[in-house]
């Protein structure tokens, strides 16, 4: 078939990065339409992509007859309306997290997709495509480590925008460890407890940073996560598996190591997620494009190759429990419907 024609909605930092990725590194696709609530930004991005045009209304962009599939990099509060429009138009969509900003609307999206009988929504949990995470998953599934027991995780950022608040550390940062836990362990998460250590004096006023998250699965596996988003250093993500027959670590800084001033050594730390997970994003998008093109060519009922709407709903449910725990200081049980109760979820 000819190249997949994609509309990218939202061309801020992440969306613009995806436009560049789709236009230069991903095979079998072209960016046909872009949209952003800052229209001058959309026009600037479109001008750099041959044949790309701006559509001012996001719902019109989704319905455009020259668009085969959609990438959502818009603000989270707009996702539910835009996802439902994609379902109405039966257009495959890669939605950056969150699926939606609350549990009820996320569940509604899952149910609406299931009613169609076609899997159209993929959620952008890119770590599943990172070569290190993928390798660890393969080794776990092959039984190389015996029984997995514990995950120790670190999630650090150099700084956050002025609009950031304490709950966003759960909803925007911890959400990735939530998906990693479910991906590696093939289990839902049963409970979350957010601890509040001594705040970083350098954090913006009113932000509880760092935070420690403790998550437990129904089988008793333990996950602890250090969340520290104002380190002033760089972007650091690490995951250590502790298991019956050994341990494994993801995210060690094993690039170039420089020895300079006598008695010191060091290397580079990724400045942000685009650098650390650039390869993961490339793999994610190439596989998504291939899945959508295959679905269109064959009339398949599945246009995804990665995290589904259910995974987005599960993450929303865990993060809601995390926000409740942050406020109350106690462990909170994760409340979810049974997946089996939704035929096709």
Swiss-Prot record:
Keywords for the protein's UniProt record, in alphabetical order: NAD, Oxidoreductase
GO biological process, one term: inositol catabolic process
EC numbers on record: 1.1.1.18
Top-level taxon of origin: Bacteria
Disulfide bond residue pairs: none
Recorded GO MF terms: inositol 2-dehydrogenase (NAD+) activity; nucleotide binding
Name of the protein in its database record: Inositol 2-dehydrogenase
TM region(s), chain numbering: none
Function of the molecule: Involved in the oxidation of myo-inositol (MI) to 2-keto-myo-inositol (2KMI or 2-inosose).
Subunit relationships: Homotetramer.
UniProt xrefs under PANTHER family: INOSITOL 2-DEHYDROGENASE, PTHR43593
Pfam family for this entry, one: GFO_IDH_MocA
Catalytic reactions of this protein: myo-inositol + NAD(+) = scyllo-inosose + NADH + H(+)
Recorded family membership: Belongs to the Gfo/Idh/MocA family.
Gene: iolG
